[in-house]
Amino acid sequence: MKGKITLFFTALCFGLTGCIAPPKGLEKERFSINSYREISPQDLTCHCKTVRLGGKIVNTTVLANQTKIEVLSLPVSSISGKPFVELQSDGRFIVYFNGFVEPENLKERYITVGGQLAGTEKGKIEQADYTYPVVQADKYRIWTLSTIYEYPTDDWDEDDDWGFFRWRYRPWYVQPEIRYYLN
């Protein structure tokens, strides 16, 4: 009986681990560079490195045969491939997609992209000059930011005196903890 329980929980753990796999084609092992900080000046000139980067989409421009996206780089989870929303940005990069991608579908969204590092491109961020690393995308996944409001559970403790009709008067409201996640 003990062996069956152990086997059940082991299978359950492996089953739940499979639920957080990265999107197909964006597995960490397929790319030689997996973060913005790993990009060196030599990588930008050789055009031979594959990268997996992610972040928040800042700007989208539709060109004649391709779509150009400016991305505010964020660290990407090595397990799920999702950008970490809470962390500081490493910088910015530009992604080129072959064909047309609807710009309205990309507003206020997050992206994980895999492709070939294709050099640099000069640009501006407001008044400052900036050199963007450029990625020619093969695979990508768009993420939507969702919000959860979590209320503290200690407010409903069984040991509290609930008063008349099993509830007590509260002249204040408990503030929820706001959590963000990508789906």
Regions found by a protein language model. Name each.
Residues 1-19:
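Sec-dependent bacterial lipoprotein signal peptides
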Residues 19-183:
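OB-fold and OB-like single-stranded nucleic-acid-recognition modules
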